[in-house]
Design a protein with these regions (language model features):
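Non-catalytic DNA-recognition/assembly elements of restriction-modification systems
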Residues: 1-15, 19-31, 118-132, 143-188, ...
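Glycine- and charge-enriched low-complexity intrinsically disordered segments
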Residues: 278-290, 295-298
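Short, solvent-exposed loop/turn positions at domain surfaces
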Residues: 103, 142, 189-190, 229, ...
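A short glycine-rich beta-alpha junction/loop motif
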Residues: 2, 68-75, 105-125, 244, ...
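Sequence-specific dsDNA recognition surfaces
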Residues: 5-46, 62-65, 69-71, 179-192, ...
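Short, Lys/Arg- and Gly-enriched loop/turn segments at beta-strand edges
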Residues: 248-255
């Protein structure tokens, strides 16, 4: 075994993003979120690895090109002679450098701490082979994600084709407030629920994605706590969930046979029978409704969308038979997405397995 510090060195940047305004050029400069702009100078002649050392995203690893730079919140990591920069980037990604952060207000990591990370010693040919194998997996993962995104775009296009743009409403559908076409608009439990290690799902806003519920990082309650919260609301299949605190406006339909409760960062809408839940889900995620949601949000330290504002959201109401036809189309697309997602999940498992094998 060797240590990370045996195969690379650090270098620093003193560039502030605010100083880049009048530096237009052809050389890329990067920050924690990626490319900032192209400027008329560069700091690194050769490809290198960069690590977010301060602030949001601390520990994130990027492989960046020759003749480029990073701003001062990033750390240059320069491979030694005989070390593949591509291999170095994968090795550092596997190390999960965020675990070294210090500082409560602004997290920070130091090279002097993470340079002691252990890894297997590989010669340059082995490094190239490892990077090549991982590249193939990453390319396949990227392709699967693109396939999923294209299927979502296909559904969006079908929605507009069948119902028209929600803003222009070319077919002249009736426009109604949500409170007029629903039997229930509420939110989750306001009193902090008593959580347990396992049991019944307790969802919060982070678990509500667009068109899906994510339970990789979820809390649990027991049956007693569920029964207490259920006196207020019992979620049902076909209800619509909306994230209403922080990152607001994400929306999905409650699936069949899914028992859960929720905290107040989720809103629930139960539409009348004239509204197909799948149609409602895609209406709410349309650009028009997302604009309405942002305009309706209250701003404090984080955005919030309250029940009263949700009731006043407006959308068109096409004939139910047309909504049902759209829902049938979505079901077919979801079958394709499931197959692709299963392949994507397998590729992610393979990638993690190879990373563990190569880097320990």
């Amino acid at each position: 075994m060797i240590q990370l510090g045996d195969i690379c060195t650090k270098a620093s940047s003193n560039i502030a993003q605010k100083d880049l305004q009048n530096c237009d050029g052809v050389y890329p400069i990067y920050g924690a979120s990626g490319l900032i702009k192209h400027v008329n100078f560069y700091q690194q002649e050769n490809p290198y690895v960069a690590v977010v050392k301060d602030g949001a995203g601390v520990g994130r690893v990027m492989q960046l090109p020759a003749k480029s730079s990073v701003i001062g919140t990033m750390q240059y990591i320069l491979p030694n002679i005989g070390v593949s920069v591509h291999y170095l980037a994968y090795a550092m990604e596997h190390m999960n450098l965020a675990k070294y952060y210090t500082g409560a207000t602004i997290p920070h990591i130091y090279f002097k701490d993470y340079c002691k990370e252990n890894l297997h010693a590989h010669n340059i040919d082995e490094q190239y082979h490892i990077a090549h194998m991982l590249d193939k997996i990453v390319d396949l993962i990227s392709h699967r994600k693109q396939q999923l995104a294209k299927l979502d775009e296909l559904v969006k296009a079908r929605f507009v084709e069948m119902f028209g743009d929600p803003v222009r409403n070319p077919y002249g559908w009736e426009i109604r407030h949500f409170e007029e076409i629903s039997t229930l608009i509420t939110d989750g439990e306001h009193v902090t629920p008593r959580r347990v290690e396992s049991g019944i799902y307790l969802l919060s806003a982070r678990n509500v994605l667009n068109h899906a519920i994510q339970v990789d990082d979820v809390d649990y309650i027991d049956q007693t706590e569920y029964a207490r919260i259920a006196k207020r609301v019992v979620p049902q299949a076909g209800d619509i969930l909306i994230s209403c605190s922080g990152s607001i406006g994400r929306c999905c339909v409650v699936p069949d046979n899914f028992k859960f409760q929720m905290v107040r960062s989720i809103a629930l809408i139960r539409f009348r029978k004239q509204i197909n839940p799948v149609f409602a889900e895609w209406l709410i995620t349309s650009d028009d409704l997302q604009r309405q949601i942002l305009q309706a949000a209250t701003q404090s330290s984080q955005a919030n969308l309250f029940q009263g504002r949700i009731k006043k959201l407006r959308g068109y109401v096409p004939p139910l038979k047309l909504q049902d036809r759209f829902a049938d189309f979505v079901v077919k697309i979801n079958r394709q997405k499931l197959t692709i997602q299963q392949s994507l999940d397998q590729l992610e498992v393979l990638r993690k397995s190879l990373m563990q094998e190569y880097f320990g």
